[in-house]
Amino acid sequence: MTPDELNIILPTLPEKPGCYQYFDEDGKVIYVGKAKNLRRRVSSYFYKEHADRKTRILVRQIRSIKYIVVDSEGDALLLENSLIKEYQPRYNVLLKDGKTYPSIVIKREPFPRIFATRDIKKDGSEYFGPYPGALIAKGMLRLVKEIYPIRTCKLDLREEKIRQGRYRVCLQYHIKKCKGPCIGNQTSNEYESNVSEIRDLLRGNLHRLVRMYRDRMQVYSEGLRFEEAQICKERIELLERYEAKHTVVPRNIDNVDVFSYDEDEHTAYINYMHIEHGGINRVYTLEYRKQIEESKEELLAAAITELRQRFESNAHEIVLPFDTGWQTGESITTTIPRRGDKRKLLELSEKNVAQYKLDKLKRAEKLNPEQRALHIVHGIQKDLHLDRPPKHIECFDNSNIQGTSPVAACVVFKMGKPSKKDYRKFHVKTVEGPNDFASMREIISRHYTRLTEENLPLPDLIVVDGGKGQLSAAYETLDKLGLIGKIPIIGLAERLEEIFFPKDPVPLILDKKSETLKVIQHLRDEAHRFGIGFHRDVRSKKQIQSELDNIKGIGKKTKEDLLRHFKSVKRIRSAEEEELSALIGRNKAKLLYEGLRKK
């Protein structure tokens, strides 16, 4: 829109609550929004600098504006939800259903069937749920079928067809799981009475059913109808056993909606739980694909409206993790609990939404391993407060025994995994005796001097195996090379798995299950393994050299032949003189045999 057009339109917008619609040059709705004050909200799009690229693109595409005034912000929220569903604007959040949770349906038909389904149809049938998983839905159905004999067939049980005698009973009738309404053995009223009780059960109202069966059992017992009293007793036991296993909500919390929120860079996740009759009888997760500068408060408020409408919730209270400003004209209490039973319910919802987000990430990572690697390095960046993701990490470890044969190792991880072709071994050349700090200075200096001189890529992070002393030695060396600020460096102290930063006496302690800590531990362990293996090889080689070199008459070629054949000095020493003679000749064999026996 041109500045002249804006100067005409914006001042005329009302300072009232309502919804606004942005149209592109084709007259298509590209964005719908709600506002407490229409003029202020719409003006902010044109008179404010936007950091978000999508917002800038949206503003450039706006060619006309329409608005609808309503009585309250709550009405604006409801209207916005309807308009987004109607027009599906390109720049609004994209609503995606969470995984399709199962519900239990009571079909609208004569002698209604009751079964689990993921397909909700608007055919007048009643739906209960959705349940958090198929096992829970099946468990509830199993309870229903243990208590009530309901039909499972798909027969058309209209009265005239039953009268015509078209049907025969099935196995369910013979095993007493169905009373045979198909042949007229059960009246519609009797069947509907059972269905009415099943509705109570599916709504979670177990206590009312238990009281009802206790009263019936008393009446049957007094009337000496012991068989019927026994059936009531068995049903009470089934209900109480189910309740003991599944009730996780205090009985004083009834008809309450609980919402929790989580998000990543591109998506918001909202979990919804409905609490009724002391039980959780509905759990659902929505995904909102973020499109344009929505706050978490706006996204959660939109989800509350959407979910309450979808499931026709009349809950008198909603429990939230933070204030959203959500309101309607209804008298609904909003609670943000800090402790107590409602806080526990909110934490349960938060666990569900976090698990949903994690499951989605795991599924995506299975399909795309590179995404998992990227997720890990971004996690390391976040946990260690780095300026860039550490896609290339180098870790150093020294190895010696009382200062003898000092060596060092450098292992390299790329995208969170070992890159063995880039591993490096070092002989420590300038250090006498056991001095790990001096050894670290030498190795860091040699390695990074070579990288800078040869213009090779530097790592995104250096990890030093050791505490503050080793870290300080490496940091001082990097400072002399002018690399401070170019390469971040940390030290890992083994005893408590503390992570130290240069010139900071307070270590960082990560969660033991943290991916970042696991990668750093893997780096440290790999450097340790590689360094010890190299040190063992060096010691072994020196030992071989010292034992065979000191025997006169045994030259380099002879040593090579012996080691190739016997593999070790120990086996050479245990060999008989005749065996040695066959390989290197009688004279050399005698010199070698006697020389090794003297040692």
Curated annotation (Swiss-Prot):
Gene coding for it: uvrC
Protein's organism: Porphyromonas gingivalis (strain ATCC BAA-308 / W83)
Protein family according to the UniProt entry: Belongs to the UvrC family.
Protein name (record): UvrABC system protein C
UniProt-annotated location(s): Cytoplasm
InterPro entries xrefs: GIY-YIG_endonuc, GIY-YIG_endonuc_sf, GIY-YIG_UvrC_Cho, RuvA_2-like, UVR_dom_sf, UvrABC_protein_C, UvrC, UvrC_RNase_H_dom
GO biological process: nucleotide-excision repair; SOS response
PANTHER family in the cross-refs: UVRABC SYSTEM PROTEIN C, UVRC/OXIDOREDUCTASE
Ranges in a coiled coil: none
SUPFAM superfamilies: C-terminal UvrC-binding domain of UvrB (SSF46600), GIY-YIG endonuclease (SSF82771), RuvA domain 2-like (SSF47781)
Residue span, UVR domain: 207-242
GO terms under cellular component: cytoplasm; excinuclease repair complex
